[in-house]
UniProtKB/Swiss-Prot annotation:
Entries under SUPFAM superfamilies matching the protein: Translation proteins SH3-like domain
Annotated stretches, region: Disordered: 112-146
Subunit structure: Component of the large ribosomal subunit.
GO MF annotation list: structural constituent of ribosome
Keyword flag Amino-acid biosynthesis: no
Family: Belongs to the eukaryotic ribosomal protein eL21 family.
InterPro entries the record matches: Ribosomal_eL21 (IPR001147), Ribosomal_eL21_CS (IPR018259), Ribosomal_eL21_sf (IPR036948), Translation_prot_SH3-like_sf (IPR008991)
Gene Ontology cellular component annotations, sorted alphabetically: cytoplasm; cytosolic large ribosomal subunit; cytosolic ribosome; endoplasmic reticulum; ribosome; synapse
PANTHER family: 60S RIBOSOMAL PROTEIN L21
Protein's UniProt name: Large ribosomal subunit protein eL21
Keywords assigned by UniProt, alphabetized: Cytoplasm, Endoplasmic reticulum, Ribonucleoprotein, Ribosomal protein
Amino acid sequence: MTNTKGKRRGTRYMFSRPFRKHGVVPLATYMRIYKKGDIVDIKGMGTVQKGMPHKCYHGKTGRVYNVTQHAVGIIVNKQVKGKILAKRINVRIEHIKHSKSRDSFLKRVKENDQKKKEAKEKGTWVQLNGQPAPPREAHFVRTNGKEPELLEPIPYEFMA
């Protein structure tokens, strides 16, 4: 048999609810506030069929460009053959959540601002760029009275 062409084909596990998370959608889902410019993750929720994104957008991250009473408009990148298109989709709020991908960046910006402020008060220069981890400091290895053992590879022998 050939594959069917349904819009929910192959989503048996994708849109299923997690173990012991079936039933009524928690109210916290509806209490979240979305504004233009927010970065959100798209994850289809099988409990609510209305306003569900197509399976190709499941797991994607996009930016909110429009907010209505029940849904939000999101700009998402979608690869079609060789090109990446910025698609605009409308999704109900049950199927999205705020992305944590930007949290580490915002935290770093806040820390850098704090460092800049302190350096300005002291009148010193501060390094803000992320630096690779330096080599470890020199240290002695304790052998507890045992002699170190020399390891060397076994020479290769051709067996025919």
